[in-house]
Curated annotation (Swiss-Prot):
Catalytic activity, EC: 4.6.1.2
Keyword flag tRNA processing: no
Annotated GO CC locations: plasma membrane
Domain Protein kinase, residue spans: 562-888
InterPro entries in the record: A/G_cyclase, Cyclic_nucleotide_synthase, Kinase-like_dom_sf, Nucleotide_cyclase, Peripla_BP_I, Prot_kinase_dom, Ser-Thr/Tyr_kinase_cat_dom
Protein known as: Receptor-type guanylate cyclase gcy-11
DNA-binding listed as a keyword: no
Free-text function comment from the UniProt entry: Guanylate cyclase involved in the production of the second messenger cGMP.
Biological process per Gene Ontology, one example term: cGMP biosynthetic process
Residue ranges, Cytoplasmic side: 539-1168
Record keywords: Cell membrane, cGMP biosynthesis, Coiled coil, Glycoprotein, GTP-binding, Lyase, Magnesium, Membrane, Metal-binding, Nucleotide-binding, Receptor, Signal, Transmembrane, Transmembrane helix
Binding site for Mg(2+) 2: D964, I965, D1008
Extracellular topological segments: 19-517
Amino acid sequence: MPCREIFLLWILVPIASSSDHITFFGRYACNVDFKTDYCTPDTYVGRAFYYGLEDGGGITTNGTFVNSDITVEFFDPTVQGNFSIGRQDGNYMSSMLDIMLADTKKNDGLLGVVGVENDCKEIAALAQAYDASSLLVNCEDQVGESQMPSSTALQMSSTQGGKYRAFAKLAKSVGWNNLAVINFVEDGPADISYHDQLLDALSAESISLDFVKKGGFSSTITSAMFTGLESVIDVILETYMKTRIYVIVLDLPVSGTFFMNAMSTMGLLETGKYFVVMMSSIESDAANYFGFNVNRGNMIFKTIDYGISDADIRQYYRSFMYFTDVPHYTKDFSDEWTSFQKRVDGDASKTFCPPMCNTKAKGIANNDPWSDDAYWYSESPSIVDAYDLGRLLSETVKVHGASLLRDPESLVQTMSGRGVTSLLGYVTKFNTNGVSQREYILWAPQQASSSNGPIPLPEWATLAARMLPDGKGNYSIIWKNLTQLGIFNGELPQSKPECGFNNELCPAGIRNLSELEIIVIAVCVVAILILVGVIAYIARWIAYERRLESSYFLVHRKHVQLVDMTKFGSSRGGSMIQSAMSMRSQYEDSGPVGGATMNFYTNGIRKAAIRRNQMQRSDKGPAANRDEWLEIVDWHLAKYENTLVTVRKINKTQLKLTREMKQEIDLLMNETHENLNRFFGLINESDLIFTIHSYGPRKSLMDLLRNDDLRLDRMFKVSFVEDVVKGLQFLHEGSKIGYHGNLKSSNCIVDAYWRIKLSNYGMEQIRVEEPESKPDDLLWFAPEIIRRYAVKHDLSKLELAKADIYSLAIVLYEIYGRQGPFGDDLLDSDEIIEQLKFPDGGALTRPDIHLITKAPYPLASVVEKCWVEDPASRPSIKKVRELLKPLSKGLKGNIADNIMNLLDRYRNNLEDVIKERTEQLEDERKRNESLLLQLLPKSVANSLKNGQPVDAEFYDSVSIYFSDIVGFTALSSKSTPLQVVNMLNNLYTNFDTIIDKFDCYKVETIGDAYMFVSGLPEVNSYLHAGEVASASLELLDSIKTFTVSHCPDEKLRLRIGNHTGPVVTGVVGIRMPRYCLFGDTVIIANMMESSGEPMRIQISSDAYELILKCGGYVTEQREKIVLKNKLEVMTYWMNDYSKDARLARLVAHQEKFPHLEHLIHKFNKGVR
C-alpha cells in the first residue's frame, strides 16, 4: 500500500475494574510520525471518530456510554507500544495479538476492532474468533463478501469490487452491451484480483467484452515522452472495429490522456461516435485523477510537458467521462462541512487528551487534508467515514443500549441496512452482509465557455449522473440533461453501429454508407437538382418568350359580337349597368336581385336551354361592322366565346405593342382571384383598341350605392369592404402586377353572387399618352397622382400601390356614406381637383369625415389613416385588412355564403329548424316555470302544473318576519307616485338579494310592509328562528346605507318584529292565486313589528327560546308590553349574531336537510 495509508486501529476492551472500558487503539500523538513535528491525516481520523461518538449521543461528556459502565480508553502503539513506524505487513496483526493476549491475561473480554486498513481479512477472522466485532473504516478488501465471510464485520469504506459492479449496472442502463476493457496497471496480486472483479461484474450484466487487455504496455512517463504510445496504438487498431466504448483502468491518469491522444491521432474523436470512460485502480481516486494539486504535479492536466496542448485536451474531453465514488472537490461543500473542518482541525484540549493532544502544526503546506493538494485531499473521505461510523455506532448504542457492544453479531446486524449522507454529500447504505454500498458518480466535462486559454481547474468537470444505492445491491440513476454537458452532440454514443461494424446486423441489400459515399451521393443529387432547375428555368423562359411573340392575347374583332342595347332603354355610351338589369333575363341568370325569387335554382336547366337558343338566334346576322365599333364611346356589352363580356375603349388612335406592354398584358391574362374581374384579351385593329373583361350582371358598386331604392344592410356593406380589400391585397402582395392604378367604385364589378370583383387594373403602359380623364373620374385618385397624371406610368409599383390605399379610402367612404366620393360637398369636380393639386394655404381637401362617423368601428379612423397626404405614412394593404377585422365581428362568410346557407337550412336541414323551435318552446316553458316558482313554492307550483288541487298544510313551528318603514306616509306625501314605486323597488330588490342567502321564503309585500318566513315550505327543524333572526340583522344593517335616490338626505328606518309558532298555508283563489299563511302566529308577528321601535328588532319569547337553542346571538330583554288584545307578554331585542355559529349549524344539519347545501356554498364563497 502507498505510504499515505491511514495508520489507525482501535480495540474495544472491557477493563477488569469496577466498570467496563472500551480501549481506543490508534494514534493521537503527532510528534513521532515520520520523525517530524506535524500531524498527519490519520490523527484527524481518530479525532473524527471520537466526535462522531459525541454527536451520536451515545456517550457522555466523560467518555462513558450512556446507561452503562463502559468507558473509552485510548492506546497509541507508536507511543505506548513497540509498533514499527515502517508499518510492514504483519504490524497490525502483531499489535492486535499483543493487545488481545494482554486482555486475556487481565481476564478482559474483547468487544470490537475499529479502523483497520491492512490485513483486513485476517483481523476480521481473528476478531470473530474472539467473539468480537470488526468495524472497518478504510479497508479495500470486502470482508463481508462470500470469499472472506465474517458475520461480525461491518465495513464502512467503498471497494473496487463495489465500484465495478456499479459501473456494470450503469453501462447496462445506457445500452452499452459491447465494451473494450484496457487496464494499464501492471500485474500484481491485488491488481489481478481487481481486474477479475471488473470482468466478472460486466459479465454478470450480460455485457460482451469485445477486447480485454491487462498491463503489458511497458510504458514509462517522463517529462518529454510516453514510451508506451506504440503499444496503445496497436490496441486501438485492433479494437476500433469491434467496439466504440473503451473502459480504461489506470493508476497514472496521464496514461489515459495519451490513450485519447492516440485515438485523436487516428481520427476517432472527431464525431463523437467513440467514447472513453476512465476509472482509477485505487479508491479515493477522484482527487488524484482530476488534478486538484495546485501545482498540477503529474496529473492528467499536466500535459504541456508532453506536447499536448490545452486545445487538444478540450477536444479529447468531449468524448470522455470519469467514474468514481469520491465527490468533486469544492472548498465549501456546506456550512456543516466548514464547521466540521474547524472542529477537527482545532486546538488541542488537555481535558480530552487523548485523543486531542496536539495542535495542528503551523507553516506546513502539504499536511492539510482540507487543502487543494490531491495527496492529502484523498484522506478527507476517510476522515468523514470515521466520523460517520462513530456517529452510527453511538446512535445505535443510544437506541438499543450499550449491551449491544457485548454481542458482535447483533451489533453488526442492527447497523446493517442503515444509511447515511456524509458531510461531503455522498450516500452510503449497508447491505445485509455488512458491506457498504456507496454512491457512485459519473463526471463529464462542462460546456466550454471558450476554446482558448488554459483549462480551468478543477471547475472543468460537472456531474453527469448520480447512482444512489438502495442497500440491496441496486441503484437509482439520476441523469443530468446531457445537452447541458460538453460531450459531443449532447448524447452518449452506442457501443456498436446500427448495422454492426461489417453490416452483419442488417438484412441483405441494406447497409450503412461511408461518409465519403454519402458526400458523393449528396453532391450528385444536388448537382442533378441544380441541372434540372436550370433546364426547367430555360424551358420556361423559352416558352414565355414564345408566348409573348405569339401575341396570344390579341382577339380579332370578328370573334366578338356586340349586343344591341338600344331596345333595353339605354344608350351605347351610357352607364354600364343601366341596361344590364333589363337584358339579364335574356342572357344570364344573375341570382336574387330586386324582386326576383330563388326558383332559378330549381329550374336552371330549362332556363339555360332557353337562353342558349335566344343567344344563337340573335347572333345569326353578319358580324358587327366597323361603324358600330366606332360609335362606342366608353364601353359596350358583347359576347365572346359564348360568354357575356364588356369591351372598354382605349382612347388612342393607334397602339404599337412594346415588350413591356406584352409583359403587362401577359400578367393580366394569367392572374386569377375570386375578387379580380377576368381579363379576356385585347382588340388592337388600327384605331379600334379595346380591352375585354368579364361582365358583372349586378351592376358596379357605384350603381348599387347610388340606387336610393336599394337598402344595404350591415352584411352587404361589410361584405363589399372585405371583397375590395382582399382583391387589392392580392394585387399588392400575391401578384406580379403589384398595384391597381385605377381603383374606384365604378371599377368594382358585382357578380351574380354579390361578390365584388376589381376590374380595369394595371395597364399603365397601354394607357400612356391616353387623354386625361374627366374631373369626375379623377376624384378617386391620390393627390400625388393627380399632380403627375401625365407621367404616372413612370411611377414605381410601390408609389402606385400607396396611391391605391388613398383610392381605397374614398371607396370605403362611398360605401358607408352613399353620397359619392366627396359626399355632399358643394364644390364641383373641377374645384375639388384643383384644390387637391394645389392646397389652399396648406389646408388639405378631403371628404367630410362626419358623414361616416356613425359607421361601425373602426371604419372612420381607418379611412383617415389611408387618405393622409404623405404616401409613406399610409398603411399597407395588409395593415388595413388587420385594422378592419373588428368590422366583421359577429358576421360569418360573405353575402353569397349566407344566401346559400339560408337555402341549405330550409331545404336540407328542416330538422334543425324543428329542433330550434322545440328548444325555443322549452326555453319558454322554463321561463314560465321560473316565473311561477317566483310566485309560489315549488311543491305548490308542481301541483298546479299537474292540475292537482293544493290542499292546506299545517306547520307546527315556523318563524315569521314583519317589517315596516317608519315615516313612510310622510315621505310618500313629499314624493310622486313614480318616485315611491322606484324607491320601494330598489329597497325590496336589495331585501330580496339578502334573504336569498338564508333559508327563507318571501311571502309578500304590501306597501311599505315586507314579510317572509322560514321553516316552510322546506322544513329545517329549529333552524328557522336563527335564519329569520340573522336575515333581520342583515336587513337592518343594509337599511343604514340605503339612499333614497330622489331624497338623498332622507334616511329610511325599519321597525322589525319576529315571532315563532304554528301556521297553516294554502293557495287562495283561482285567478292570480296567492300563497298565504294563516294563524295567530302571523298576527303576533305583525304585533311584534307594530309595537317595536325604529331600527330595532323585537322578538317574542317563543322566538327567543329557539334563538337560545341556536346559539351565537346577542339579545337584550325588554320590559313586558301589552299587545292589542290586552295580553301582557315578555319580548326581547335582537342585537347581533355570530356568522361562524350559523355556518356550524348549517353544516351540522346539512345531511338531514340537503337543501341547506347551497347556503353553505354561498357562505364559503363569501356571500354572507
